[in-house]
Amino acid sequence: MKKTLCLLGLMSCMALLPSMANDDCWKPAEWPVLKHYDSEHLKEVALPLGGIGTGTVALGGRGELRDWEIMNIPARQYSTVTIGNDAPFFAIYTKAPDAAPQTKMLAGPLYDDEYIHYEGRPVNHHGLPRFTHASFDAAYPFGQVLLTDEQMPVSVRIKGFNPLVPGDEEVSGLPVAILSYEVTNTTQQPLEVAVCGSIRNFIGKDGSQFWTDWKGDMIPYGEAKNHNEYRSDDAQSIRAIQFLTDGVDSLSTAWGNMCLATDAVAGVSYRTCSADNAWSASVLDFWDDFSDDGVISNPTANVRKSVGKDQDPMASLCQKQVLKAGETRCFNFYLTWSFPNRKAWSKSIVGNWYSTVHPDAWETAKEVISRVGEYERQTLLFVNALLASSYPDVVKEAALFNLNTLRSQTVFRLPSGHMLGWEGVMDRFGSCAGSCTHVWNYEVATPFLFGKLARSMREVETEYALHDDGSMAFRVTLPLQNPDPNYDVAADGQMGCVMKFYREWQLSGDNAFLASHWDACKRMLGFAWKERGWDGNCDGVMEGSQHNTMDVNYFGPNPQMGFWYMGALRAAEEMAVAMKDKAFAKKCHTLFLQGSQWMDENLFNGEYYEHRITDPKTFEFMDPASPDLPPYQLGKGCLVDQLVGQYMAHLCGLGYLGDQTHIRTTLESIMKYNYLDDFSTHFNNMRSYVIGHEAGLLMASWPKGRLEVPFPYFAESMTGFEYTAAVGMLYEGMEADALKCITAIRSRFDGSRRNPFSEPECGHHYARSMASWAAIPAFIRFQYSAVEQTMSVARREGTWFWSNGYAWGTLSIDAGEATLHVLHGDLTLSTLTIGDKRYKLRRTLPAGEQAIIAL
């Protein structure tokens, strides 16, 4: 603290007088670690902290906060300011008796490629002293950064998380990043320690608007008359800075409020404004003040010339404690926010669910601080249950780490509660609007972990995308209203929606949900039978023009659309039986038998299923050697996800859609022809998601001859498609091959080259990557029906995490007995099938209870 203080500065120091203990603050438990990233594998690590549909800020691999994406749009690598020392940061002050104080930024060292720039500042905080060593531990959503430095008398573990509790979308949708700085005194004497967070008030600056100065620097803008207020509540043990604005348009997507809070009461000091930033003096003034004694105060009047002029004043919140020799203490901070004006792909504001529940970041901070221990316990219960299971670590990693997509700007919830999503997100805007059906068909994390949200997506599809004639827009418009008359249909997307509706009905057991949407489901499937449609002659085979997830139209029967169609017929048959619609059930059954047999007899070539191309006008089969073949087809290619419909059928409990031996042979062929141990000699004319000496599954291979112009993505490799093949292998007992594929994927996301918490396709945090969760139920053949009140698993010794979207827990199996433990929600079961034996339960197990079955 500087010697000359203004009145506000004196007032801020009074909090230091009573004590510096803060013994009642939240003390994080020991967090699990699934994956460790050493100092050579940190550069791309960015773990998103935020709730479902709230946006996030990421905890970087070396401890910095990066990717500030809390204002309704993506903002990769956006730090709220022009690259420099003004970006948000946390710093630590230490003072040992009879020793000079030391101050450093709480982050690890610069990387080797961060040393060159036309102004010598290619990275934020380039001029701040840093710790010399960093590493990162993760078990999503828990991230931990360990900072050490031989010159510092402390080691620091930065812990960051946001509550993630399957089955509880509200707790999992809190707009908060929780940070705890665990500081350990590594000396043999007492130590003064202060930790301080500093953030400029960037309300209005969401990273979408920049101007370029004379040097070429990109200067973000949008802030207007922003100011910061210090707030406290002794009853709830909270001190905070609230970030507000008087000038940003209240209809701007970047309008809202934020809060940086601490649960410390003693030893708290703060700044609500900053010095004039000419020649970067504001950081200089802060650093001098903080480094003096670990206590801060607002700049004096003659220094803070920018007050009233500075549109984005920097605020700082600091807490100071005394650590005994060898002692560890926690310095906790909570960043909360509310930015209600989401537009997504609409021209008008559609809003956010979370901001209707949490409109005031200050109130949110109070709520979170009062319940943080409970939120941590609930999240740990989930993560520890999964990590303690007997699944291979790489399966846990792929399933767990890809849940980040649910918290990214890919996903949002409308004020009505409906969940929607982009396909993924680019650096500054969403990628491919409309909850695209043929992309979201692949992911299964939402239905198995957040059933209510999955059902809301089915409501959107049936109520706002489906036309009277049964055609469905595969991209829904916003605001939600009558289906868009200018729309496109997708065969795979629409057939998948029938299967997904069946899945949500089965997992929820809500017969009213089915009854109220049964007519819509019939129209969805029935559209395939329109004249000159996908199956216009109603023979169980799709011959028509089939738009699909390859962003082209396939002409003629092919396995990708064919198995989606077979799955939709099976799902519709089961729903029709439940609705006592005998005629429709019979029709679906007949078409399924015809279509399945035809595909096995006419598309299976002895190794895999192929595509028989038809004339787009006549629907007649064409000679594969004809020069008049339409472009962008599959033909005789071996497609990585040709069995995607079978993948979904297994997950839904609908059985085999084709000959079982053909299914297995096809997966063996995919492994034989599509898997590459090394991509360094592979030619790819499109996007490269696998490069050099990395391994993975190709989208398509051509053992029987390639078309001159195949479908666009044939030479690529994308994780969501790879997971469907790997999961199919699990169902066929090809465990070694499945794990080889999944390991190849996750090895590419090693923190050095790619972010372990974002698997991209057409954009970061791509929705299809959540197909990785399917390996969890597939590994133990998990099936659950709330309609029939049944659960079944393979008889496989070990402890296995299970979930159905509403309840979750573990099932432990050994030679003599099985223990079914419910950890969250209520589970009603009539029978439990383990292997080939059925056991009657006829009871409801609430959370915390278990059933023991003698085998």
Indicate residue ranges for each PLM-predicted region.
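Beta-strand-rich N-terminal accessory domains
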Residues: 22-110, 248, 389-390, 398-402, ...
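Non-catalytic C-terminal accessory modules of carbohydrate-active enzymes
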Residues: 64-66, 72-78, 83-89, 96-159, ...
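Short, solvent-exposed loop/turn and secondary-structure capping segments
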Residues: 47-48, 57-61, 67-71, 81, ...
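Active-site core of glycosidic bond-cleaving carbohydrate-active enzymes
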Residues: 427-471, 515, 519, 552, ...
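Aromatic-rich carbohydrate-recognition surfaces in CAZymes
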Residues: 91-97, 101, 105, 111-116, ...
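The feature captures the catalytic groove of carbohydrate-active enzymes
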Residues: 170-172, 180, 267, 284, ...
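Bacterial Sec-dependent N-terminal signal peptides
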Residues: 1-23
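Acidic/polar, glycine-enriched structural segments that form the non-catalytic walls/loops
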Residues: 22-31, 36-41, 45, 144, ...
